[in-house]
UniProtKB/Swiss-Prot annotation:
Location of the transit peptide in the chain: 1-72
Membrane topology value: Multi-pass membrane protein
The keyword Plastid is annotated on this UniProt entry: yes
Chloroplast intermembrane side: 73-96, 151-207, 293-370
NCBIfam families listed in its UniProt record: tpt
UniProt keyword Methyltransferase, yes or no: no
Protein role: Mediates the export of fixed carbons from the chloroplasts into the cytosol in the form of triose phosphates.
Keywords: Chloroplast, Membrane, Plastid, Transit peptide, Transmembrane, Transmembrane helix, Transport
Taxonomic superkingdom: Eukaryota
Topology feature Lumenal, residues: 118-129, 229-272, 392-402
Descriptive protein name: Triose phosphate/phosphate translocator, chloroplastic
Amino acid sequence: MESRVLSRATTLSSLPTLNKLHRLPLANASLPSVKSFGSVSDGGNLVWGRQLRPELCSPVLKKGASLLRPCPATAGGNDSAGEEKVAPVGFFSRYPALTTGFFFFTWYFLNVIFNILNKKIYNYFPYPYFVSVIHLAVGVVYCLVSWTVGLPKRAPIDGNLLKLLIPVAVCHALGHVTSNVSFAAVAVSFTHTVKALEPFFNAAASQFILGQSIPITLWLSLAPVVIGVSMASLTELSFNWLGFISAMISNISFTYRSIYSKKAMTDMDSTNIYAYISIIALIVCIPPALIIEGPTLLKTGFNDAIAKVGLVKFVSDLFWVGMFYHLYNQVATNTLERVAPLTHAVGNVLKRVFVIGFSIIIFGNKISTQTGIGTGIAIAGVALYSFIKAQIEEEKRQAKAA
């Protein structure tokens, strides 16, 4: 049986025989042909993908030479099994901080573009239920095309997971529609200021519905949020009750979405989960859109919009607003998976600052001094709350690890 170990000492001791090998006739010095193997199941040694024969098998070594050389691999040889190749390091792996920054920039950029284009559509086509359906429909088509080409590969869904995702999708649909009703009724900056109250509703739901103990420091950090939103609401020039109440319902809906999401934790990747939620939410949103806005749309809605901007622009605006809506949500999910909870929290706060600031600049919304101060206080409160909550979560994680 062939030996499986080639002793380094044997090889080193045979080095003086190099000159002897050099003087041997070519016919006697030639080594037997050695074939390169992708894998070796029994006998032989692999060095950089070449199989070496033990010294007992070499006719040259019988003449006193014990130096072994690997033969060149054949053209069809496969070195992958014998040599552990170092995978090339890509740009994203080499510069993780820069990559994360790029993800955040893309998330903010898509979010700002969506909010601006969305509000421009409402200025000439004030039908938020229908536009909400378009947002989800474009996203669903995008997901179906992605599944078709295998980017990503569709993850199968069973009845149990479907039952868990339906409540999440219903809350997502309600929160999405009411957000758009608010966007159509009031200034974008005001809607986002009211939606800054979402952490307050999350804390309340955790305390009184889930029975979780919320530290007093978290409750105190929410006081500036409530005060700031109240100040901004009292002097908001575009204020109306429809916009305010719709934004509040959106906060409650997204809070319940978070609760149901915790119950629907699964190993499925976030891209597939969001795709299934979008499909279910679309089915939920279609009936109210047809009932509430359908007759008016067929009578005057579509014709008025086409008369104002033209058919091509109208259709392209609806397509792109849906595309930006889906992409910003998907990139947000992918971004937040890359970072720690504290970075996640800061990112959410900065996103809202970006959207409020750009919407004021683009649309030239006039805001009173009190509204500006109230918005700033609310954003600062959200930042404080997010920081404290992230610290608490990190302490819990370290305690579990210990």
